[in-house]
Amino acid sequence: MGFLTGKRILVTGLASNRSIAYGIAKSMKEQGAELAFTYLNDKLQPRVEEFAKEFGSDIVLPLDVATDESIQNCFAELSKRWDKFDGFIHAIAFAPGDQLDGDYVNAATREGYRIAHDISAYSFVAMAQAARPYLNPNAALLTLSYLGAERAIPNYNVMCLAKASLEAATRVMAADLGKEGIRVNAISAGPIRTLAASGIKNFKKMLSTFEKTAALRRTVTIEDVGNSAAFLCSDLASGITGEIVHVDAGFSITAMGELGEE
């Protein structure tokens, strides 16, 4: 028996076997969790259904976090299969492509700012609102952030602001939901070569710099993040809430890589 045996967890954001959400689902399944999944549109539905089968699940629900109706419907449908459940993984982020290239000040638009915050940050709150009536005591909510929430990252631009908003939401939600025993945390993951990351300019250079600078001198994997996520959603982490847990091979603690000899 794994430490998530008996837990029911909804996983969002699964788009490929390179997705962080895939690594999370894999680790959670290995620890005994029962999983459900969401998909954004008809194009992704067959792919997510195949992944769901891989993880022994037949619960695959549509979810477009851009609309409140879709969010409400998702959890209403989930409740027909699970009257109560133990948490969800919010692995959702988006900004228009023109917001992720070059000079932030010149690239920024009102609409781009709105979309980035709506999809990447507000959606976490909206999902918690809709899920709240169906959550078991001691449930755990988990989202995914990035170091751009704390530092200026080239080409990450408006997503730096959106992730900062997401991390603030994590703390405020934790304070609010804590009285019901519900924990809320975020993982700030190091850069991983995912479909989402492919939209960031010079991402290969970012990975190279990361590997040279991180305390462990390596990049992180979806397995690294998945194992940490499984722990945070388990009763082993019962005293942890409102935290931003860095799973980044120690990159965030360093100021520069090795200087070498003069």
From Swiss-Prot:
- The residues that the entry says bind NAD(+) are G13, S19, I20, D64, V65, I92, K163, I192, R193, T194, L195, A196
The answer to whether keyword Oxidoreductase applies is yes
The alphabetical list of record keywords is: Fatty acid biosynthesis, Fatty acid metabolism, Lipid biosynthesis, Lipid metabolism, NAD, Oxidoreductase
Instruction: Spell out the SUPFAM superfamilies in the cross-references.
Output: NAD(P)-binding Rossmann-fold domains
Q: What's the stated role of this polypeptide?
A: Catalyzes the reduction of a carbon-carbon double bond in an enoyl moiety that is covalently linked to an acyl carrier protein (ACP). Involved in the elongation cycle of fatty acid which are used in the lipid metabolism.
Molecular-function annotations in GO: enoyl-[acyl-carrier-protein] reductase (NADH) activity; identical protein binding
* The protein's name: Enoyl-[acyl-carrier-protein] reductase [NADH] FabI
Point out the annotated site residues (description: Involved in acyl-ACP binding). Answer: K201, K204, K205
Q: Family, per the entry?
A: Belongs to the short-chain dehydrogenases/reductases (SDR) family. FabI subfamily.
Q: Which PANTHER family match?
A: ENOYL-[ACYL-CARRIER-PROTEIN] REDUCTASE (PTHR43159), ENOYL-[ACYL-CARRIER-PROTEIN] REDUCTASE [NADH], CHLOROPLASTIC (PTHR43159:SF2)
Q: Which residues form the active site?
A: Y146, Y156
Indicate which residues the UniProt annotation says bind substrate. Answer: A95
Which InterPro entries does the record cross-reference, listed alphabetically? Enoyl-ACP_Rdtase_NADH, NAD(P)-bd_dom_sf, SDR_fam
Q: One Pfam annotation, family name?
A: adh_short_C2
Question: Which CDD domains does the record cross-reference, listed alphabetically?
Answer: ENR_SDR
Pathway where it operates = Lipid metabolism; fatty acid biosynthesis
Q: What is its EC number?
A: 1.3.1.9
Question: Which GO terms of type biological process are on file?
Answer: fatty acid elongation
Which reaction(s) does the protein catalyse, per the Swiss-Prot or TrEMBL entry? a 2,3-saturated acyl-[ACP] + NAD(+) = a (2E)-enoyl-[ACP] + NADH + H(+)
Q: Does the keyword Methyltransferase apply?
A: no
